[in-house]
Amino acid sequence: MEGLHIFNGFSGSSEARARHAAHQLGIPLHVADVTETFDEEIVQYLTREYLVARTPNPCVVCNRKIKFKTLLYYADRLACHFVATGHYARVFHNRQTGRYALLRGLDQAKDQSYFLFLLGQEQLSRILFPLGELTKKEVRSVALTMGVEAVREKESQEICFIPDDDYKTFIERHMGSSPAIPGDIVDRSGRLLGSHNGIHSFTIGQRKGLHIAAPRPYYVLAIDREKNRVVVGHEEEQGFSGLIVSGVSWIDGESPREEVFETLVRIRYRHRGVSSVVCPLSAGDEICPATGRPADHEEAGDKLIIRFQEPQRAVAPGQAAVFYSDDRVIGGGWIEQGIPLD
């Protein structure tokens, strides 16, 4: 068994903790410096998405383009067939079909399968998730029994490379030649309610930081990039009946046989999921809910329409929509547009 620490340029003291854990386990530790690739694939992606009024999901992209790619590269160099990570998820191998399924972790409160929907069959065939069958409490107990003291540290809920979870400052530091442009904050009727210092500071469903003096709280309903304005409304105005996704990826490598099917859709990490109907957005014969007119070929592409069985809040373009059948991840895609309630 070999250990690997992936250094992304922001890891701080994590390498020292990794070395200490490797020493306690009695295994060698290798260090992969992915600083340059991480900046290109993750930091620039995150900054670019916020600047075009989308809410990125760097953890999903990192798992596909950085973490597992690096792990498997080093595994090949070290003649190791399998790689293991601390994700709370499970992999099931169907020996009859030869296919691999990605399942939720047994600890539903810690399940991380949402972040792994871009993994494919080749990757899943070599991945082990030993924590997937355990609860967080059981993991701590086993680790302490083995003498791994790192589990005593407070668990961070922040993105690993953004200090103090301060997205605004981080983005402004990496914007380069794309300065933030001040604009208006308006309600759905266009009534001016306030001003902002750049749309990169906002995401759908946001309540804090609007600085609007009003007897009732406002929430971000939409971010209008073309007019450089933030549209807000009250809680009852936040409902969405569905969404459109693009860049769809299927765990099996193939889409479901049924063109229209029912599934559970999660639209963010802490979202419990909503029963939904999924169907393709077809050019010409389908009204695009985002525009109110027939979709053209460019708009349709490989996009899907998801219709919620119950209205949902905070459908943020740029986030992942992940499809489940019970505990099994079917696939997912990127939210292009929420469909407001009529």
From Swiss-Prot:
Disulfide bond recorded as keyword: yes
Annotated region (Interaction with tRNA), positions in chain: 110-112, 268-269
Record: active site: 62 (nucleophile), 160 (cysteine persulfide intermediate)
First-listed, main subcellular location of the protein, grouped into a coarse class: cytoplasm
Alphabetical list of Pfam families matching this protein: tRNA_Me_trans (PF03054), tRNA_Me_trans_C (PF20258), tRNA_Me_trans_M (PF20259)
Location of this chain's protein in the cell: Cytoplasm
Enzyme Commission no: 2.8.1.13
Keywords: ATP-binding, Cytoplasm, Disulfide bond, Nucleotide-binding, RNA-binding, Transferase, tRNA processing, tRNA-binding
Highest taxon above the source species: Bacteria
Disulphide bonds in the chain: 62-160
GO biological process, one term: tRNA wobble position uridine thiolation
InterPro entries per the UniProt record, alphabetical: MnmA-like, MnmA-like_C, MnmA-like_central, MnmA-like_central_sf, Rossmann-like_a/b/a_fold
Single GO term (MF): tRNA-uridine 2-sulfurtransferase activity
Residues at which ATP binds: 86
GO cellular component: cytoplasm
Transmembrane region(s): none
The reaction(s) this protein catalyses: S-sulfanyl-L-cysteinyl-[protein] + uridine(34) in tRNA + AH2 + ATP = 2-thiouridine(34) in tRNA + L-cysteinyl-[protein] + A + AMP + diphosphate + H(+)
Record-marked site positions (Interaction with tRNA): 87, 319
Protein task: Catalyzes the 2-thiolation of uridine at the wobble position (U34) of tRNA, leading to the formation of s(2)U34.
Similarity section: Belongs to the MnmA/TRMU family.
Protein name per Swiss-Prot or TrEMBL: tRNA-specific 2-thiouridylase MnmA 2
Organism this protein belongs to: Syntrophus aciditrophicus (strain SB)
Origin organism lineage: Bacteria, Pseudomonadati, Thermodesulfobacteriota, Syntrophia, Syntrophales
